[in-house]
Amino acid sequence: MPETQEPASLNERDPMFEREKEKYERPIVSREYILSYLEGTGRPLTLEDIIAELEVAEDDQEALRRRLRAMERDGQLVRNRRGAYGIVAAMELVRGTVSAHPDGFGFLIPEAGGKDLFLSPREMRKVFHGDTILGRAVGEDRRGRIEGAVVRILERALKHIVGRYYADNGVHYVVPEDRRIPQEFAVVEGEGEGLTPVHGQIVILEITQYPDGRNMPQGHVVEILGEHMAPGMEVEIAVRNYGLPHQWPDEVLAEIKQFSETVPETMKAGRRDLRDLPLVTIDGADAKDFDDAVYAEVIENGFRLTVAIADVATYVCPDSALDREAVTRGNSVYFPRRVIPMLPEILSNGLCSLNPHVDRLCMFCEMEMDAAGRSTGFRFDRGIIGSQRRFTYDEVAAILAGDAELRAQDAAMVPHLEALHSLYESFAKARERRGTIEF
């Protein structure tokens, strides 16, 4: 009579057991196996069901409970009304991001693609624009849109809001400036010690209680921006509403202490010296930083063109605090009368700006072009330059148009500007031959 085969232990059934063993002193059932098991059962299971069916030891049951809660928090599982865990897809739930409309309604944008779910103003009272949630389709509205309901909020998009502070008959509340947030916020008394906003001022509120559809959200004032109509207030509001990083982390401030306002002689070694070349910058009249400089001259059968850009990489090392913050910011943001730079001012307006009559490190390309604007040779290199003039677009246009006073003032530069313009015309004709469309 053949021996009865013992059922495989949980350790043998869980394909990720060895990985869990490396991570934990007492390995527990992996997320992958939990998902696979629930998918196989085809029905939601309570914690007690899972413990019994997977034969989880008593000493491991608390760890399993925490794992299930973590999977629920991460949107891998969802609990129904009786506390049973199920797979999101199997329970016909949709994970996505809330997109709010100023008129009070919104949409759930599915992460996996597909049709958006319409969220009524009633459902939107539970969430904010940008929240990550689980939703469920519950039918169609009168316009034929698939209507959704909020099942669970996985991640809140907002921790602070900017709004106008009101104090009416002892009631203190804030109305958000972002019209996509229709809820008013009750101001919690006793918080934000030392801050006493005045009726009508713009404040920053830290959210302490989120809406649930029944109760008013709450928060306490952490910053007073000023009067509603103060000059520049619209910029301050926009910066906060769109979450633009506008303060430098401490590690960035510590890192830039190594820089001086001038380029050290040691950093100039091994670079090609272009300081005698009449490179110039050409930008708008209100430009604050100058990223590139140009020079052109007429040579036999064409032109020689040199384009130099600031050598930012020399100052911003990979994975440094500066590098990480620059990645977070992505680019500089320009407002009327204000710039939020991608790099601290000592770099953006200083060492990495090709200001006139100061030494700057650069990367440059020296190109030779024929009369038709075709490249006949080029080279890239690291160099050091001293821009010889900061031109504006209007000044260059006037010089090329024949302004006698400006041409006399910059007589040494005029031939190079005319060479640049002639080369531009060659490029423009080549573009036209290729069928390029001007917008």
Curated annotation (Swiss-Prot):
One of its GO terms (molecular function) is exoribonuclease II activity. The keyword Translocase does not apply. Keywords: Cytoplasm, Exonuclease, Hydrolase, Nuclease, RNA-binding. Gene3D superfamilies: Nucleic acid-binding proteins (2.40.50.140). Residues 271-439 form the RNB domain. It is an enzyme of class 3 (hydrolase). It comes from the Bacteria. One of its GO terms (biological process) is mRNA catabolic process. Residues 11-22 have a biased composition (Basic and acidic residues). Its EC number is 3.1.13.1. 3'-5' exoribonuclease that releases 5'-nucleoside monophosphates and is involved in maturation of structured RNAs. This is Ribonuclease R. It comes from Acidithiobacillus ferrooxidans (Thiobacillus ferrooxidans). The lineage of its organism: Bacteria, Pseudomonadati, Pseudomonadota, Acidithiobacillia, Acidithiobacillales.
